[in-house]
Amino acid sequence: VSGRLEGRVAVVTGGGDGIGAGVARLFAAEGARVLVAEIDEAKGRAVAEEIGGLFVHVDVTDRDQVEGMIATAVDTWGSVDILVNNAWGGANLGRVEHKTDEMLHRGFAMGYYGPFWAMRAAFPHMSRAGWGRVINMVSLNGVNAHIGSLEYNSAKEALRTLTRTAAREWAPTGVVVNAIAPGAKTAALQRRIAQNPDIAAAVDAANPMGRLGDPLTDIAPVALFLASEDCRYVTGNTIFADGGGHINGVAWAPELPDAPAG
């Protein structure tokens, strides 16, 4: 282990499972002090204890909790150098015409407003230090308009726009902002596979490498690069860490219910 993040303070939302847990583990192994922000207290505490980090219970749809998360990192360690916006709570599978206002509001609260609030709260600390790294987890689903998950697709594409806009505005301050579109065994996908095991085979078959990525060994190293000193001249990008899946697009489609999503 090279200690590429030695002395840095990292905040990882959704850090109790899947990609977030993989990122938290690798960042800690590389020397960072990691705040694990998670709505599932048992999972979040377990990861934080494992890596010697700090757990904070956070619902990213609550602005006060998100701002408090950043304040806790600063109060505890004096700074926040790295922010990974990863948390997501799932979407209601259904056709566009069956989506409700509440579904869209919740999707944007999780996938757009939560990251925005965290970025807004973290930026003053990063800019004063003249150094900062923001990593937003986005999705190929938004790029290729995967059917059935409008609120997820839309929020993730809005987050890509936020990524590029912040990257342009914040570049003079030493704060770089990038996104990762992972093709990985996320917690949400695992839940969907549990309900419909055929999805796993379909997703693997559609990938040029024949498999989904592992959060720790395939996705977290990309986040490590974006969080490191090596990323000083890289900003406003989306990296597709998906085994080439973006070349094929989303080649599988779920069966959508005829009735409105519940």
Feature roles, as predicted:
Residues 116-119, 131, 212-241, 246:
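C-terminal substrate-recognition "lid" of short-chain dehydrogenase/reductases
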Residues 2, 93, 235-262:
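Short C-terminal tail/terminal secondary-structure segment
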